[in-house]
Amino acid sequence: MAVKIRLKRMGAKKSPFYRIVVADSRSPRDGRFIETVGTYNPVAKPAEVKIDEELALKWLQTGAKPSDTVRNLFSSQGIMEKFHNAKQGK
């Protein structure tokens, strides 16, 4: 089972709000998911990002692949750097 960390769209029309979820890559964007890792609100100024760092690192270490947008959000929070350091044994 290929697992991805991606955004699930929530909120009203023209007012998106996203949950960062771990889901099977074959399930639809807003369909079934395994676990919620955090939230992302691009409408708020500045954009509001809340991520459970321990959960995100756990899923990255078990092989979940983040989408491009989630990778950028993780990088801005410093999670990708911690993941790469842990992977290389630093």
From Swiss-Prot:
- What are the annotated GO cellular component locations? cytoplasm; small ribosomal subunit
Protein name, as recorded: Small ribosomal subunit protein bS16
* Alphabetized Pfam families for the sequence: Ribosomal_S16 (PF00886)
Please give a single GO biological process term from the UniProt record: translation
Q: Which UniProt keywords apply?
A: Ribonucleoprotein, Ribosomal protein
User: Which proteins does it associate with, and in what oligomeric form?
Assistant: Part of the 30S ribosomal subunit.
Could you say which protein family the record assigns here?
Answer: Belongs to the bacterial ribosomal protein bS16 family.
GO molecular function (one): structural constituent of ribosome
Q: Which organism is it from?
A: Bacillus subtilis (strain 168)
